Amino acid sequence: MGSEFGLANLRSVQSGGREMKRQGGGNNTKTPSRFWRWKMVVQSLEGVGSVQSSIDVAANPHSEDNSSPKKRRVSSRLQVKQKPQKELLVRQRVELLDDNEQGPRKKQANVRGRQTGEVADSEELPKATDSVEKSDRVRVKETLRLFNKHYLYFVQEEEKRAVKAEAQKKASRAAKRGAKKSKKGDLKKADTKVAKRPDLKALTKMNDEKEILFPSKRFGSIPGIDVGHQFYSRAEMVAVGFHSHWLNGIDYMGQSYSKGKYSNYTMPLAVAIVISGMYEDDLDNAEEVVYTGQGGHNLTGDKRQFRDQVLERGNLALKNCVEQDVPVRVVRGHDCKSSYCGKIYTYDGLYKVVKYWAEKGISGFTVFKYRLKRLEGQPLLTTNQVQFINGRVPQSISEIRGLVCEDITGGLEDIAIPATNLVDDPPVAPTGYTYCKSIQVAKNVKLPTDATGCNCKGSCVDSKTCECAKLNGSDFPYVHRDGGRLIEAKDVVFECGPKCGCGPSCVNRTSQRGLKYRFEVFRTPMKGWAVRSWDFIPAGAPVCEYVGILRRTEDVDSASENYYIFDIDCLQTMKGLDGRERRSQAVCIPTVNSLERPDDHRSDNVPEYCIDAGSNGNIARFINHSCEPNLFVQCVLSSHHDIKLARVMLFAADNIPPLQELTYDYGYALDSVLGPDGKVKKMFCHCGAAGCRKRLF
């Protein structure tokens, strides 16, 4: 996929939603000059959270170096002012040093401009360069996103196989009843077998394509994976090279590692273990663990031992760790309904194997025991890292601290969205807007007629015959799992519309079903209002639509203090204008009048339409910027096929645990914002991400 979405541009924020106001941190924050028009372009699924390809970030949260997206276009109202600096600015980048390349700390920037969020002319800021280095943290996130993409692809393949097998089964039953005769061998043996798990197929593909992040095993910590990192399956650990076995509890180096830099060690040696209650003899006292060796127990039943364990392979590897003083990575598994495997795995840090022995286990068979002690000086697992496992998520609105509004939607949404404020004194609720559930259309905007739909009945299942599937590149963009998940980002997603023969349960209507997660709007000290979910959100799941008033861009008053304008620039992205990279997931664009007008070139550089959420909007207006966001933007077409009027949807870029703030990258080009005096404006970023670029623009 391309490195940038470029699907929509955002202009700043006022009282309710964007970080533009929040940089000052408080109700008294001064709104930026009303003559400004800021542009923000959202990154792609591959780059949204970790800022890929054209923009990479360092894992060190204290770094004063910055990174910025590729220089992007701005609105026509700013082009004249920016023209003298354009050629210079388009080449500028901010250098980011990786952990191993971190230079001397720069002097802390003067923050006298914090009340407005702007940077004073005298303040020292990092200089822009062309050097950008990708951090280990970013590489881990990219790899997990790649795994999720492969996983969802094979989920779709399994769904197809199941549909085909069910059809063959029905045909076979009909033949037996004499309804019709089927030829011998109609029911293929391959279709009657249990399919290989999609996650294991994804790992096989990643291994074949050499996409495993750290394919060679190593002692100690894995770069980019800190204590508290959570994996939503054993397969995710394999994908990044953290633990190379999707089933065994002990990962170890075999004899093949006895050469080279490990020639002084006696192999095998253990590198990681998983504690997840697989053995009846395990004892766990947090800082000290008695771990039972592997082998001889019932994997699929009650986990009881049925034969003696043998001191070989993983068991021998842990014994050798005692004798050679080699620490192992310890991962703790917890039951979690949100994970497709029923568990979630949290990295607890490095442990030293201090002792081993053999004894008769509870079931009467010989087992090997290992005493492990946690190494000192490591960060502890904090409450916010495990709170969703231990039930800290509020079960009802009455349990919320700092409640200032029980439902900001006024009952319009099926699920109430409360607002909380533990920052202001006295606490205040979000104001200055009217909540609306769906797009409102300005009087002078005429929507296209409904597009001709597919002829599917009930639900679309056959991508070869469904006309909507063909528009998406001959297959459906979603899978059924978890209520519908987008496999990967596309230039635009074509969903089934009002003239299609399928019903509301069709998988190709996934983004049309409204909000399905329990959200909360909460006040932050530095960024104003923010949004989080009480529920786990899987990668690829639709989160919400950006809702407001659909207007012509030329009708937006440049002098008004409205900073919730979201330009619909899907067409500009698809045409690759202004140096934007096009995605590999090309789609078939239907011929519509709006794309054939002879004067179409006039709107190539500036989108014709925008969504104004200033006075009317939904929960999306409260979602903040982050340099490492967990959401991405996707243009969607359903009722019509005019790309210039596409719906703007926010999807989960990662598996998002409960209570984690929802964010996406506003995508400013560095030094792209000019004030009324023609000078470049600068603003600090307070997103708090480890790879924060320090400047919003």
Regions found by a protein language model. Give the residues of each.
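C-terminal interaction modules of eukaryotic adaptor/scaffold proteins
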Residues: 650, 658, 662-697
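Acidic, glycine-rich low-complexity segments with interspersed aromatic residues
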Residues: 111, 115-146, 150-346, 444-448, ...
